[in-house]
UniProtKB/Swiss-Prot annotation:
Keywords: Metal-binding, Ribonucleoprotein, Ribosomal protein, Zinc, Zinc-finger. This is Small ribosomal subunit protein eS27. Its cofactor is Zn(2+). GO terms for molecular function: structural constituent of ribosome; zinc ion binding. Pfam families: Ribosomal_S27e (PF01667). InterPro entries: Ribosomal_eS27, Ribosomal_eS27_Zn-bd_dom_sf, Ribosomal_zn-bd. Part of the 30S ribosomal subunit. Binds 1 zinc ion per subunit. Belongs to the eukaryotic ribosomal protein eS27 family. A zinc finger (C4-type) spans 20-42. The gene is rps27e. GO terms for cellular component: ribonucleoprotein complex; ribosome. Zn(2+) binds at C20, C23, C39, C42. GO terms for biological process: translation.
């Protein structure tokens, strides 16, 4: 009997480093937010919640592990 490779599955959510399109501010956000995430400098919406993965409205620079 073969054992599964991953006994403990890894989460599908990630932290993302994004760049605001309006002001260029870099900020770290969660990929599955429960509330709307806004830019700390200009207040533009970066990520909107959808019940699962959020709609990312900023440029993704890096996916953090």
């Amino acid at each position: 009997m073969a054992l599964p490779k991953n006994l403990i599955p890894m989460p599908r959510s990630r932290f993302l480093r994004v760049k605001c399109i309006d002001c260029g501010n870099e900020q770290i956000v969660f990929s599955n937010p429960a509330t709307t995430v806004r830019c700390l400098v200009c207040g533009a919406t970066l990520v909107e919640p959808t019940g699962g993965k959020g709609v990312i409205k900023a440029k993704i620079l890096e996916v953090l592990e």
